[in-house]
Amino acid sequence: QCEPYLTTDYVYGAEQCEYAFLAIPYLLKASGAKRVFFCTKKDKPALIDACEKWRKKYSSLPVELVLAKDAYPRGYERNLVTLVTGKEYEHIPIEAGCIVDNIYTYIALGRYFTQGKSADRRCVTVSGEVAKPMNILAPYGVLAEDVLSLAGFKAEDDLKIVNGGPRNGNVLSDGHYVLLQQADG
């Protein structure tokens, strides 16, 4: 996760990490890949502990955990490919022999492959000048204002609503924005 104020990947990843591991056999078969690298920042102990726990349980899977120093924008896929392989590429990661996915994608696929459940919700970070900053697991289609209200946001507070983070986010005119799969904070 390259956005500095979003924590959805770390929180949801730590809580649902086993599903990511359950997706790996399917993804290895579909992609022809020989191994998987889980990369996270060194300052995310809950996610690191979860990855180590499930890596031990599923020790037959070719998974390596790569810990990166906290450097913005560490989640940027070019940085990850270079960190893990030492290679660079011009257009897309496959040029360096890599497929880069977010842990959220692995979790969603793990839930689908093992339980037949499609991705129908998204964990979003609500932070900034709200009364109760938090991560919220919300169904797709809910209005942003409903999610924001859980964190104590009030329209009259005259705060900016940013969909995403400062790097890739966009300012919304109001909370009448429908939560979609791409939203994460």
Protein language model annotation of sequence segments:
Residues 9-14, 36-39:
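Metallocofactor- and cofactor-centric catalytic cores in central/energy metabolism, strongly enriched
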Residues 28-29, 116, 177-179:
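A general structural signal for short secondary-structure junctions and capping/turn motifs
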Residues 14-30:
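Histidine-anchored nucleotide/phosphate-binding helix
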Residues 1-9, 130:
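Gly-rich Lys/Arg/Thr-decorated short loops/hinges at beta-loop-alpha junctions or inter-strand turns
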Residues 34-144, 150-157, 165-166:
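Hydrophobic alpha-helical positions that pack around
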Residues 153-157, 166-185:
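Ubiquitin system architectures
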Residues 162:
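Alpha-helical ds-nucleic-acid-binding substructure associated with the helix-hairpin-helix region
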Residues 19-23, 50, 146:
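Long, highly charged amphipathic alpha-helices
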